[in-house]
Design a protein with these regions (language model features):
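Short, Lys/Arg-enriched N-terminal segments with co-localized hydrophobic residues
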Residues: 1-16
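Conserved histidines in hydrophobic membrane contexts and catalytic metal-binding motifs
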Residues: 17-250
Length: 250
């Protein structure tokens, strides 16, 4: 009898496994986990980074100095309407895009990336290298180590989608770059290593590896559906296994 049981056990071991409901769920869960598991891990790791690093640090706010208030004593400047009348090519701009600012205490209007003298209405020259250095020196915590003019950028650049040309000023803190619009003279962006890691992980998170801005595309939708099915199949497998154990125990 012992020999018979041993032979039967060996036969059962090499007998093709029947595709029961539990086996089907297990196989499906295994393959789905293989396909979607890597992206699930990337979503988790990137999401963890997003929650651990404060957004203020990513934006480089801790490296910025608040600009000092500069009183403008001459109030004989032109109104926005008068300035627009002097420049018909800028008349397509809406009043919401007009900013009142100053350069060394002199009032100016900013219309997009164009600077206009608020007293005369004349267009001002683009920001010089020295002016860009002065702007960053007044706004950055750290020592300036370099400056260059950025004329164009790639679609995945750390300075994509912003005013060009722009001055890129490097300081000695966290390999930070301060970007100053050559036309507007505004400090438009600060890029640090924390931001670069954020940008890289963001590309992995939304699966847009080129422009890093679009999360409404087919690839991320398919992986999201597969990930949901993976989780649901795992839950179903747990329930089926639990019931099978209950029946065996009974």
């Amino acid at each position: 009898k012992a020999l018979y049981l041993k032979q039967r056990t060996l036969l059962e071991r090499f007998e093709p496994m029947k595709l029961t409901k539990k086996n089907y769920l297990r196989q499906m869960h295994r393959w789905l986990g293989l396909i979607a598991g890597i992206q699930l891990l990337l979503w988790t790791v990137s999401g963890l980074y997003f929650t651990l690093i404060p957004i203020e640090e990513i934006r480089g706010d801790h490296l910025r100095l608040e600009p000092e208030a500069t009183p403008v004593t001459n109030h004989q400047w032109l109104s926005p309407r008068q300035v627009l009348n002097l420049h018909p090519d800028l008349n397509t701009k809406t009043s919401q895009e007009i900013r009142l600012s100053h350069t060394d205490g002199h009032p100016i209007y900013l219309i997009g990336s164009v600077r206009l003298d608020a007293l005369t209405g004349k267009k001002l020259d683009t920001v010089s290298k020295q002016q860009a250095l002065d702007i960053v020196q007044a706004r950055a915590k750290g020592r300036i180590t370099g400056i260059d003019l950025v004329q164009s950028v790639d679609s995945d650049s750390e300075y994509r989608g912003r005013e060009l040309p722009a001055w890129r000023v490097t300081i000695d803190q966290e390999e930070a770059h301060f970007y100053v619009g050559a036309g507007s003279g505004r400090l438009l962006a600060v890029r640090t290593n924390a931001w670069r890691w954020f940008d890289f992980l963001w590309a992995l998170h939304i699966m847009d590896y080129e422009n890093r801005d679009n999360f409404n595309h087919l690839l991320v939708q398919v992986l999201a559906v597969l990930s949901a099915i993976t989780v649901l199949s795992g839950l179903a497998l747990f329930v089926v296994t639990l019931r099978a154990r209950g029946q065996t125990a009974g």
